[in-house]
Amino acid sequence: MNENKASNRMWGGRFASGPDAIMEAINASIGFDRKLYAQDIRGSLAHAAMLAETGIISTEDEKKIAHGLNTILSEIEAGKFEFSTRLEDIHMNVEARLAELIGPAAGRLHTARSRNDQVAVDFRLWVKEELLRIDVALGGLIEAFLVRAEEHAATVMPGFTHLQTAQPVTFGHHLMAYVEMFGRDRTRVRDAVERLDESPLGAAALAGTSFPIDRHMTAKTLGFREPTRNSIDTVSDRDFALEFLSVSAICATHLSRLAEEIVIWSTSQFGFIRLSDAFSTGSSIMPQKKNPDAAELVRAKTGRINGHLIGLLTVMKGLPLAYSKDMQEDKEAVFDAAETLDLMLAAMTGMIGDMEVNAAAMKKAAGSGFSTATDLADWLVREAGLPFREAHHVTGRAVALAEERKCGLEKLALSDLQAIHPAITENIFSVLSVGNSVKSRTSFGGTAPAEVRRQVRYWKKRLKRDASLEKKG
């Protein structure tokens, strides 16, 4: 039998009895949305200031509210605030404490506001701040890549397709491929900030309010570009949270691909890199083991972030306008994805800066698998005037012969090559070394060391430009 506890709830006026204990448990979000305390208080301070400015509440009440809210902020940050599940969420917890501190004036704070627009502004502020943190972290990761790419602009390694040796490339060029990926991730982060940079405050429950509020004032106070333009849309959607998860999932996928390569490169079979003790662990039974656990966990945690994206998409897919309590499920997904991605970015930045490169092993592997076969075909087109399809066929025969002789293309005798095609001359051997192969790939974006260094210079300038944009913003 339920005790009548409805009257002391902020929404309990029309209820004759209080909720069941199970209802309280499933309804409460304070266990996770307490993370929004700073944003909630910030939004309330802006709302109270606007209410006073527009004459909706008195200046005296606004001062009491502001003092009380700042007191609550200090209590939470000092670990002295007692959160209550009975009060459901961060909004009600803060408001209840405010009433204890300043009395009836606290009841004026929620004028012209609903929890629907209140939570939307809290969450947007939090996501915006997290996106800006990710932006900085991505900048740091790119910087770590640039240092290593410049260092290894001429370090030859095998390039792969289908994880089979394809053509020689440089390690610097390979690393710069990830710079491009993470650069696009950073662009997506900034695009997401641009789209969510609208203030929901003032949309109220869904229809706006009859009070003469100034939504542009609160938007400016909270650092938003402008207020949202449709009050129903404002409280109905969480596409900014979905976009955050999408951006995070794409970035995590790039991190996972890199982590997979680090795992492969660090095996004794490849031996391309050696991870430091700082990012490795050992085995409880095999004394010789040095396991790339940090990279493996980066790879694994990508699935966690992808799961959060699919989960929230599924939550949102069938909701009618406007607000539904289903949307309470948005925050844990975003909070966990953000924490996970922050950790992944930090771990990867450390591994890239810390790894030891075995250039000799890379170069040796680059010469295997007939990796300069394309150079042979290109030489036949360029020097002998053959159509590329014919050159491709001739080169295939040369590869088959080398495979039969169990040697590299560069070890075949000139007479053997001329027996395949008479136009081949001794000059062919100049293009069959892996070093000359990478030097010849001078096309824009190619693997030639000079071109890799140009790519590095471009990205250094771009990082400086992006940093200056941050300061202007």
Curated annotation (Swiss-Prot):
<dbReference type="Pfam" id="PF00206">
    <property type="entry name" value="Lyase_1"/>
</dbReference>
<dbReference type="GO" id="GO:0005829">
    <property type="term" value="C:cytosol"/>
</dbReference>
<dbReference type="Pfam" id="PF14698">
    <property type="entry name" value="ASL_C2"/>
</dbReference>
<dbReference type="InterPro" id="IPR008948">
    <property type="entry name" value="L-Aspartase-like"/>
</dbReference>
<keyword id="KW-0028">Amino-acid biosynthesis</keyword>
<dbReference type="InterPro" id="IPR029419">
    <property type="entry name" value="Arg_succ_lyase_C"/>
</dbReference>
<dbReference type="GO" id="GO:0042450">
    <property type="term" value="P:arginine biosynthetic process via ornithine"/>
</dbReference>
<dbReference type="InterPro" id="IPR020557">
    <property type="entry name" value="Fumarate_lyase_CS"/>
</dbReference>
<dbReference type="InterPro" id="IPR022761">
    <property type="entry name" value="Fumarate_lyase_N"/>
</dbReference>
<dbReference type="InterPro" id="IPR000362">
    <property type="entry name" value="Fumarate_lyase_fam"/>
</dbReference>
<dbReference type="GO" id="GO:0006526">
    <property type="term" value="P:L-arginine biosynthetic process"/>
</dbReference>
<dbReference type="InterPro" id="IPR009049">
    <property type="entry name" value="Argininosuccinate_lyase"/>
</dbReference>
<keyword id="KW-0456">Lyase</keyword>
<dbReference type="InterPro" id="IPR024083">
    <property type="entry name" value="Fumarase/histidase_N"/>
</dbReference>
<keyword id="KW-0055">Arginine biosynthesis</keyword>
<comment type="pathway">
    <text>Amino-acid biosynthesis; L-arginine biosynthesis; L-arginine from L-ornithine and carbamoyl phosphate: step 3/3.</text>
</comment>
<dbReference type="GO" id="GO:0004056">
    <property type="term" value="F:argininosuccinate lyase activity"/>
</dbReference>
<keyword id="KW-0963">Cytoplasm</keyword>
<comment type="similarity">
    <text>Belongs to the lyase 1 family. Argininosuccinate lyase subfamily.</text>
</comment>
<protein>
    <recommendedName>
        <fullName>Argininosuccinate lyase</fullName>
        <ecNumber>4.3.2.1</ecNumber>
    </recommendedName>
</protein>
